[in-house]
Amino acid sequence: MTSATTTEATAKDLQEKLSLKENDVVEDDGKVEENDAAEEGASNGEKKKKKKKKSSKKKKTPQEQTNPPTVGLSKIFVNKKYPVGEVCDYAEDNLWRTTDEEKRALDRQNFDQYNDLRRAAEVHRQARQYAQSVIKPGMSMMDVVNTIENTTRALVEEDGLKSGIGFPTGVSLNHCAAHYTPNAGDTTILKEKDVMKVDIGVHVNGRIVDSAFTMSFDPQYDNLLAAVKAATNKGIEEAGIDARLNEIGEAIQEVMESYEVEINGKTHQVKSIRNLCGHNLDPYIIHGGKSVPIVKGGEEIKMEEGEIFAIETFGSTGRGVVHEDMECSHYAKIPDAGHIPLRLPRAKALLNTITQNFGTLPFCRRYLDRIGESKYLLALNNLVSAGIVQDYPPLCDIRGSYTAQFEHTIILHPTQKEVVSRGDDY
């Protein structure tokens, strides 16, 4: 009896296995999937066994950065998630935002925008770290900017208006506080006694990271740099949702002007440069509609949720006021200029070139040279005079004075504040 039952069971098991093979597909992960094609084949007397193929995709292996840095960040961060900056809670009135579930959900919705900024910020950190290690007195200013910009282009994997340099690299020296980058033929050499502001911009999908630092090679300038760095950090500390811009400016000035610096045996109070300021950043637009003053007396406008700001401060041993001086190098297409008729054919052609290559991002003459433009100065000046392109000449305090700058980009998340460009250096 036992033997007969075993034989019947074995036959039954065999029949079930055959039935399974004829009518189903056994997947690699052990799941069984009904196969209509096999059933149709069975009705026609054609029974086929089908098996799902394994995916042949290989996991990407992250590359390591080279020295000098040349590997694009997408090859290092293969999961496309880039490092988060310094995260700070808001002040007490807004501390509830940190744990509010609705605000956290809103924050998650904006991940792509934040990730673009974080990618740009990581490019900035790596580019400036390399720059600080190789820039030395005796280099030409042209070599300085080429070192920074070539590194930036490689790391951000420059791709037209999708990713690239956010604005011309500023390397303003001594009494010149901002908007100097060398034009073709500039033979200026970086000297041991120079104070150089290094202002670097990186963008990804138009999301701009704007961050700056100051380099000096003589310790007598250390207190000037310390004053400006402390003032910038105070501005970052005071910034936040509902923070009033005028109150931020007052706090910055108080810290800045508490410092003194002795240069060549003469003591100077460090002054906030009152006609320079920080600003909000819009997509593809370096200066949005809001300005963050660095002295008291600004507008009583509030910062708002979701805004992105460049908090930057400038200190000077001079008058604390800048004026336009020297040859212009920086330009940008005005976003809301509208259609303005141009009579000069060369100006029309140059405008098309600017629109295709830079959009509303700032550019400089070197960038026009780089893409093959020549004999364009008359046309460029025509675009400026027509109100289509804005020129940004160098901004200088009195000669013989020294100026310094530090700057960070911050994101006002619904939940917290992120200093996205923060690094170990500043």
Swiss-Prot record:
Basic and acidic residues: compositionally biased ranges? 10-34
Subcellular location as annotated: Cytoplasm
Sites where the protein binds a divalent metal cation 1: 199, 210, 407
Tagged with keyword Zinc: no
Keyword terms of this UniProt record: Aminopeptidase, Cytoplasm, Hydrolase, Metal-binding, Protease
Offer one example of a GO biological process linked to this entry. Answer: protein processing
Q: Record's PROSITE patterns?
A: MAP_2
Give the cofactor binding note.
Binds 2 divalent metal cations per subunit. Has a high-affinity and a low affinity metal-binding site. The true nature of the physiological cofactor is under debate. The enzyme is active with cobalt, zinc, manganese or divalent iron ions. Most likely, methionine aminopeptidases function as mononuclear Fe(2+)-metalloproteases under physiological conditions, and the catalytically relevant metal-binding site has been assigned to the histidine-containing high-affinity site.
Q: Which GO terms describe its cellular component?
A: cytoplasm; cytosol
Give the binding site residues for a divalent metal cation 2.
210, 279, 312, 407
Compositionally biased tracts (Basic residues): 47-60
EC number, UniProt record: 3.4.11.18
Give the protein's cofactors: Co(2+); Zn(2+); Mn(2+); Fe(2+)
Q: Which SUPFAM superfamilies match?
A: Creatinase/aminopeptidase, Winged helix' DNA-binding domain
Sites binding substrate sit at 179, 287
Which GO molecular function entries does the Swiss-Prot or TrEMBL record give? aminopeptidase activity; initiator methionyl aminopeptidase activity; metal ion binding; metalloaminopeptidase activity; metalloexopeptidase activity
UniProt cross-references to InterPro entries, sorted A to Z: Creatinase/aminopeptidase-like, Met_Aminopeptidase_Type2, Pept_M24, Pept_M24_MAP, Pept_M24A_MAP2, Pept_M24A_MAP2_BS, WH-like_DNA-bd_sf, WH_DNA-bd_sf
Family to which the UniProt record says this protein belongs: Belongs to the peptidase M24A family. Methionine aminopeptidase eukaryotic type 2 subfamily.
What is the role of this chain? Cotranslationally removes the N-terminal methionine from nascent proteins. The N-terminal methionine is often cleaved when the second residue in the primary sequence is small and uncharged (Met-Ala-, Cys, Gly, Pro, Ser, Thr, or Val).
- The identity of this protein, by name, is Methionine aminopeptidase 2
Q: State the species of origin.
A: Schizosaccharomyces pombe (strain 972 / ATCC 24843) (Fission yeast)
Q: Give the classification, highest ranks.
A: Eukaryota, Fungi, Dikarya, Ascomycota, Taphrinomycotina
Gene name of the encoded protein: fma2
